[in-house]
Design a protein with these regions (language model features):
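Terminal (often C-terminal
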Residues: 1-13
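A short, structured loop/turn motif at beta-sheet edges
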Residues: 11-13, 37-44
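Extracellular jelly-roll beta-sandwich "head" domains, especially the C-terminal globular C1q domain
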Residues: 3-6, 25-35, 44-102
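Short, well-ordered beta-strand segments enriched in hydrophobic/aromatic residues
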Residues: 15-22
Length: 102
């Protein structure tokens, strides 16, 4: 499933892998994870993603937030506070996010 440009979700049983190859943060913020692939509960057990900000790298994770009857995904760079670096359009995500669903 293509979630955004340069962002693909793959499912193998209960294992979900989201691959990023230079996905722009703003595009990822607009993406929707299919309901059958939501983490249950909304906790991601593994992460291995990198946010590229100019020449700097920031490890980070993906956060799911409810928005009506869907979940919207946000990239949160190396912090518990999503506002620290924001989800600006020039930021790009590289790597993979892996998690399990119930």
């Amino acid at each position: 499933v293509t979630l955004a440009e340069n962002c693909i979700l793959k499912r193998c049983g209960k294992h979900i892998i989201i691959s990023f190859t230079g996905c722009i943060c703003l595009d990822w913020k607009k993406a929707n994870i299919p309901e059958k692939c939501f983490p249950q509960p909304n906790v991601i057990n593994e992460r291995n993603t990198v946010l590229l900000v100019g020449a700097s790298y920031h490890l980070g994770f993906v956060m799911l937030e409810p928005d009506g009857h869907r979940y919207v995904v946000y990239y949160v760079p190396d912090t518990n506070r999503s506002g620290d670096l924001g989800n600006n359009s020039e930021y790009k995500i590289h790597g993979e996010l892996a998690y399990f669903i119930d």
